[in-house]
Regions:
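Beta-rich accessory regions
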Residues: 31, 59-360
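Gly/Pro-rich turn-and-neighbor structural signature
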Residues: 1-101
Length: 360
């Protein structure tokens, strides 16, 4: 959890599913103990680079606030229940506030420019930017019986409550794009895939997205035989995968990945290693007693060199990519699944988002 905390946020969130409430703290954690077995820098080590990223991260913790009477005067204390990273890439310094109009807790953060060498930062005369607003919530999933591979009790981002039928109620922090961002869609070109399609590595199912300013939503059904599933954003006309951005789930390792395009043509010192985060899909018991895996739902916002990704409203990335061109040559959906049972259930995109309007 780092050697120093800064930009701390405290909040109480209430679920719309069952009315339960939990206390949360979001902190910027500076420094890291690389020798600790649970260090994020040990589990997901960075490649050797000329200028590695700062050893800092955004963390959230869920617990129960109480009064500690073990001191001369009662002091507030929190019993830790669960936690994870608030963002798994470059976001830092988050602050949040309660929006009286929507009743939601809204968070903003700083997306840094650590992956650019200093000469390029100096040339552009600015560094970093503010993220899109994120709605925070207490997510509650009922009737959970398992995950892709991990035991439920080993998933440290979940609070588990045993239900009467032997299933579990799982709670975690929900992080989703603010609904107010829908105002940016005005005037954008709407493209979609309406029907389910079986996916393979050779699939040609895609969306005709052309600009570097778009919002994307995609829903997938992931089979037991699937090894990887996701989509690729092409930045060159020849659809060269080396210069594409690929966002996908590795099911065996339960890891969500973002492979960023090669930017050595711009500057060999730009960092383009893959972003990764622990992520799994939950298995849920249905009223008829059958077990159904939840969908993989991905939302992505791309704006020139900024990519923000949200998976199932509980795993997020805010990263930077520096593509070869200032446009996109489409998005293709695919799966590494020989059975043909993994599907794209549907997708839609708003291409050419406007940035010159005021979001109310």
């Amino acid at each position: 959890m780092g050697h120093n905390w800064e930009c701390a946020n405290f909040m109480t969130l209430t679920s719309e599913v069952d009315g339960s409430s939990r206390d949360f703290v979001i902190v910027g954690a500076e420094g890291a103990d690389r020798s600790h077995p649970n260090s994020i820098f040990t589990e997901y080590p960075q490649p050797v680079t000329k200028f590695p990223r700062e050893e800092r991260s955004l963390q959230w913790m869920c617990g129960r606030l109480r009064a500690d009477h073990g001191m001369a005067r009662p002091a507030p204390a929190m019993d830790y229940v669960c936690g994870s990273k608030f963002d798994h890439a470059l976001m830092y310094g988050v602050n949040s506030f309660h929006d009286p109009q929507s009743g939601k807790q809204i968070a903003y953060g700083w997306i840094t420019e650590e992956d650019l060498p200093q000469p390029l930062i100096d040339r552009q005369n600015w560094s970093g930017l503010i993220s899109i607003p994120r709605d925070l919530s207490l997510v509650v999933v009922k009737n959970v019986v398992g995950a892709l591979n991990s035991k439920l009790e080993d998933i440290t981002s979940l609070e588990l409550e045993l239900e009467s039928g032997g299933t579990y109620k799982a709670r975690t922090l929900g992080i989703s794009p603010s609904h107010k961002l829908e105002a940016l869609r005005g005037g954008a070109r709407h493209v979609k895939v309406s029907k389910p399609h079986a996916l393979s590595l050779a699939s040609r199912i895609g969306l005709d997205v052309q600009t570097c300013r778009f919002e994307l939503f995609a829903a997938f059904q992931v089979s037991d035989h699937c090894r990887r599933i996701g989509f690729s954003i092409y930045h060159t006309q020849d659809l060269n995968p080396e210069f594409a951005t690929s966002i996908y789930l590795e099911t065996e390792s339960e890891t969500l990945m973002i492979d960023r395009p090669d930017s050595s043509h711009v500057d060999p010192d730009i960092l383009t290693f893959s972003e990764r985060a622990p992520f799994t899909l939950l298995n849920i018991m249905q009223p008829d007693g059958s077990i159904q895996r939840e969908q993989l739902q991905v939302r992505a916002f791309f704006d020139e060199s900024v990519l923000e990704v949200f998976a199932n409203d509980r795993c997020t990335f805010a990263t930077r990519i520096y593509p070869a061109t200032k446009r996109v040559w489409g998005i293709r959906f695919w799966a590494d699944d020989d059975s043909g049972h993994s599907e794209l259930l549907g997708s839609k995109a708003w291409d050419g988002l406007r940035a010159d309007i005021r979001v109310q």
